[in-house]
């Protein structure tokens, strides 16, 4: 994705949405049935990136609350889709201690 525009944070919980929302960040919260349409609209409106944002801590035993996890792919019922490598590297380099 390009470097201009805003980032869209996709969340499940209202608490996560409140944490993620800020300057340059819009939020799509708990819209599973409308997620694709909402993301397509955000891209048409100039979104430069999409992140999945959550506060769950049970991903792996070696992770603690507050750890940054940068994914390399997205898994859906339709298969696995790679994330943007350059953007992932930029995030890993910018976030202290990020796990990729």
What positions do the PLM features span?
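Glycine-rich phosphate- or other oxyanion-binding loops that anchor nucleotides, phosphorylated ligands
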Residues: 2-100
């Amino acid at each position: 994705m390009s470097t201009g525009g805003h980032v869209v944070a996709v969340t499940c919980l209202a608490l996560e949405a409140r944490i993620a929302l800020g300057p340059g960040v819009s939020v799509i919260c708990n819209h599973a049935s409308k997620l694709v349409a909402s993301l397509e609209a955000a891209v048409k409106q100039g979104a430069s990136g999409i992140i999945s944002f959550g506060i769950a801590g049970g991903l792996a035993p070696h992770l603690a609350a507050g750890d940054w996890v940068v994914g390399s792919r997205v898994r859906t019922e339709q298969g696995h889709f790679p994330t943007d490598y350059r953007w992932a590297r930029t995030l890993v380099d910018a976030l202290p201690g990020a796990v990729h």
